């Protein structure tokens, strides 16, 4: 069947990545399956100014900015109309809007005030922010996202010293940080803590800078004989495979503390090796299986790691990818058909 026959095409890694992202575009101009997917996709599209992509023999790919902005505003407003407010969705909606156009002009002033008033109700007396205005418990994840909501909206963050002290109180003896004062360290909450300390003060304010640096470094796969995983970072010490997400958080975290501790070449090469030759996206191994899956989020983490290292030029390399392209198949098969026909005619003439 033409619709399922793969064809190998040579384009730049960047072009394959953009094609992959557009293959996950939805009818309402959003991308993927979550607000985060849309925010990630638009950041990459915006970086490459790929809002309209026209390639010979391929359908035009594009983002209708005004339609997407309208959709995002409606989604935020619907949350407040129903009372089902999700700060993580709000963050990603605002991030997307701000990429498309400054929030100063793209966000309705009444909606801006609704968001700001709600956020103010999540502030905790002891520092940090709770995930909802009905909760009295701050956690690292909600504090990270609410801090960044305020930052995107251009609103001041009051009591920064109090919030910084709360973040520091989540420090653990392993050098990592938990989601609150009682939880064990995780890579993600440790990164959020390091980011917040750097934003609310200076990186030297970390409870134990060396221990936190070693926490990140302990997840690095530095065995050059491990060709498949060398250069990546594990999500935890019990994991079998490095992930693009864990590598992103480790690279960003180490970069904030001491950038010289990073292995730029090894990690960049590992990231490139994660690009799928089937769909052009970047993929991770799935624990417990022998399969890999590409997604917008994994592709975004790959993009951000290369961007951090100043290595996005590596995506200019031309590579062959297997694509399911009906038009290309028709062209290829037509050429083959012509060649076969010529051979047949020559053969017939020789027989005569």
Language-model segments: what does each one mean?
Residues 1-6, 30-60, 78-107, 130-158, ...:
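An alpha-helical repeat/solenoid feature that recognizes helix-turn-helix modules
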Residues 12-31, 59-83, 109-133, 157-176, ...:
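Long, well-ordered core segments of solenoidal/helical folds
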Residues 316-335:
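Juxtamembrane/start-of-transmembrane alpha-helix segments at the extracytoplasmic/lumenal side
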Residues 346-348:
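Structural signal for the C-terminal ends of transmembrane alpha-helices
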């Amino acid at each position: 069947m033409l619709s399922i026959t793969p064809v190998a095409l040579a384009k730049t890694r960047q072009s394959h990545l953009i094609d992959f992202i557009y293959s996950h575009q939805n009818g309402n101009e959003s991308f993927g399956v979550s607000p985060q997917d849309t925010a990630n996709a638009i950041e990459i599209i915006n970086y490459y100014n790929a809002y309209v992509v026209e390639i010979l023999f391929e359908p035009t790919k594009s983002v209708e900015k005004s339609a997407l902005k309208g959709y995002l505003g409606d989604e935020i407003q619907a949350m407040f109309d129903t009372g089902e407010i999700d700060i993580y969705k709000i963050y990603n909606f605002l991030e997307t809007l701000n990429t498309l156009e400054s929030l100063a002009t793209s966000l309705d002033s009444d909606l801006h005030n609704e968001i700001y008033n709600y956020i103010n109700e999540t502030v905790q007396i002891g520092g940090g922010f709770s995930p909802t205005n009905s909760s009295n418990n701050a956690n690292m994840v909600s504090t990270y996202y609410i801090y960044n909501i305020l930052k995107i909206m251009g609103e001041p963050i009051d009591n920064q010293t109090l919030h910084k002290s709360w973040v520091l109180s989540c420090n653990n003896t392993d050098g990592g940080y938990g989601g609150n004062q009682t939880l064990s360290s995780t890579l993600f909450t440790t990164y959020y803590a390091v980011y917040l300390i750097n934003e609310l003060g200076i990186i030297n304010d970390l409870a134990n800078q060396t221990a936190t640096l070693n926490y990140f470094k302990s997840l690095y796969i530095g065995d050059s004989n491990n060709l498949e995983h060398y250069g990546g970072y594990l999500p935890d010490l019990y994991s079998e495979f490095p992930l693009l997400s864990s590598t992103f958080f480790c690279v960003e975290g180490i970069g904030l503390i001491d950038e010289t501790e990073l292995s730029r070449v090894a990690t960049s090469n590992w990231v490139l090796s994660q690009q799928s030759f089937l769909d052009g996206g970047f993929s991770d191994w799935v624990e417990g299986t022998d399969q890999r899956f590409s997604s917008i989020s994994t592709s975004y983490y790959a993009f951000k790691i290369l961007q951090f290292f100043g290595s996005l030029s590596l995506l200019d390399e031309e590579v062959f990818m297997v694509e399911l392209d009906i038009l290309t198949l028709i062209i290829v098969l037509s050429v083959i058909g012509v060649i076969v026909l010529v051979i047949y005619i020559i053969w017939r003439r020789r027989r005569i």
